[in-house]
Amino acid sequence: MATDTLTHATAHAHEHGHHDAGGTKIFGFWIYLMSDCILFSILFATYAVLVNGTAGGPTGKDIFELPFVLVETFLLLFSSITYGMAAIAMYKNNKSQVISWLALTWLFGAGFIGMEIYEFHHLIVNGMGPDRSGFLSAFFALVGTHGLHVTSGLIWMAVLMVQIARRGLTSTNRTRIMCLSLFWHFLDVVWICVFTVVYLMGAM
């Protein structure tokens, strides 16, 4: 009886330790996101200062294609929804559904990056690269930094899917899913700001 009680207490303490470690990691990730907020705030401020510095070159109205960017936006928004479904599946302990929803999220994110690469390539080959004007430098810096963050999120997501497939929904993998969720939804919010400030206002 005493042995059973001791075993139960040890297991409870071990589980409690896992929860504490997971909570600490998520808190630490929130701090990282705050630093990312500062980075993007600086990039937005730089863009606001340089937006009229076209040096006689093209303006936002000349280069932005809103229908194209809307498709990009919907891809990223849909990826946020599918990631939410992956989180729900995690709480239901359904490993296969978690992997399936993450894979769909990855495809939406990859589509977004593919369209962004196409947009950048189209601008550069037509002589509208970041060296053309202050406006274009700020544009490429802001949108490109967001794109690099999405790309890193896709790499993280691919690695996470492999880890879940091999080890299941362990407490460590659950913490990773939650941290990536914070990161992914943060990038959605940043993109909505980019879409509004850069593309919508620039196309007016």
Curated annotation (Swiss-Prot):
Q: Please give the superkingdom of this protein's source.
A: Bacteria
Give the primary localization class. membrane
Q: How does it sit in the membrane?
A: Multi-pass membrane protein
Kindly give the Pfam families that the UniProt entry links to this protein: COX3
What are the record keywords, sorted?
A: Cell inner membrane, Cell membrane, Electron transport, Membrane, Oxidoreductase, Transmembrane, Transmembrane helix, Transport
Output the GO biological process annotations, alphabetical, semicolon-separated: aerobic electron transport chain; aerobic respiration; electron transport coupled proton transport
User: What transmembrane ranges does the database entry give?
Assistant: 32-50, 67-85, 102-120, 143-161, 185-203
Which GO terms of the cellular component aspect does the record hold?
cytochrome o ubiquinol oxidase complex; plasma membrane
- General function of this protein: Cytochrome bo(3) ubiquinol terminal oxidase is the component of the aerobic respiratory chain of E.coli that predominates when cells are grown at high aeration. Has proton pump activity across the membrane in addition to electron transfer, pumping 2 protons/electron.
Q: Which NCBIfam families match?
A: CyoC, PRK10663.1
Fetch the PANTHER family from UniProt. Answer: CYTOCHROME BO(3) UBIQUINOL OXIDASE SUBUNIT 3, CYTOCHROME C OXIDASE SUBUNIT III
Family membership: Belongs to the cytochrome c oxidase subunit 3 family.
Q: How does it assemble?
A: Heterooctamer of two A chains, two B chains, two C chains and two D chains.
Official protein name in the record: Cytochrome bo(3) ubiquinol oxidase subunit 3
Q: Which gene encodes it?
A: cyoC
